[in-house]
């Protein structure tokens, strides 16, 4: 995505690849992970985007985001030491509002507090695919929104924004 190059952000498709585990008895890596899109700056993965082709449903709890998808995002965030991940779904008229970020979840913020690492965040977003020329700008908006986020502090097991 050329629109992010001036920010020093390097976009890669299904790269870098890492393994989630190591099988001790066979002495080999196991469970290859290939995130759909990674964005790096200064050689470090800053965010990961994973595309889903199922439709969200405004009438369902959590709009139908699968728990297994959150587990996958947690694995990516942990293995790539990345604090920002995105689940990206196609937008459709039944969702009502315009495309973009629909929900933000902190991934296991209590454990992160104990380790003194920043909380990991997953955003659920949609993209309007009706006009493919707008896709780069929609992605840019999601990325720039990440860059504008203040770090989340956890105090006594409660995210700081919940204290306001």
What label would you give each PLM region?
Residues 1-164:
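Catalytic core segments in nucleotide and nucleic-acid processing enzymes
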């Amino acid at each position: 995505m050329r629109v992010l190059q001036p920010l020093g952000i390097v976009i890669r498709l299904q790269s870098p690849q890492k393994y989630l585990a190591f099988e001790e008895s066979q002495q080999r890596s196991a469970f290859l992970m290939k995130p759909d899109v990674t964005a790096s700056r200064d050689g470090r993965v800053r965010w990961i985007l994973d595309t889903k082709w199922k439709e969200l449903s405004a009438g369902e709890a959590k709009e139908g985001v699968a728990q297994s998808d959150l587990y996958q995002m947690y694995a990516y965030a942990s293995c790539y030491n990345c604090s920002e991940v995105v689940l990206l779904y196609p937008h459709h008229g039944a969702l009502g509002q315009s495309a973009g970020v629909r929900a933000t979840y902190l991934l296991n913020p209590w454990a992160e507090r104990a380790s003194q690492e920043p909380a990991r965040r997953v955003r659920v977003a949609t993209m309007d695919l009706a006009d493919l020329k707008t896709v780069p700008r929609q992605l840019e908006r999601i990325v720039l929104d990440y860059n504008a986020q203040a770090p989340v502090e956890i105090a006594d097991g409660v995210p700081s924004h919940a204290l306001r």
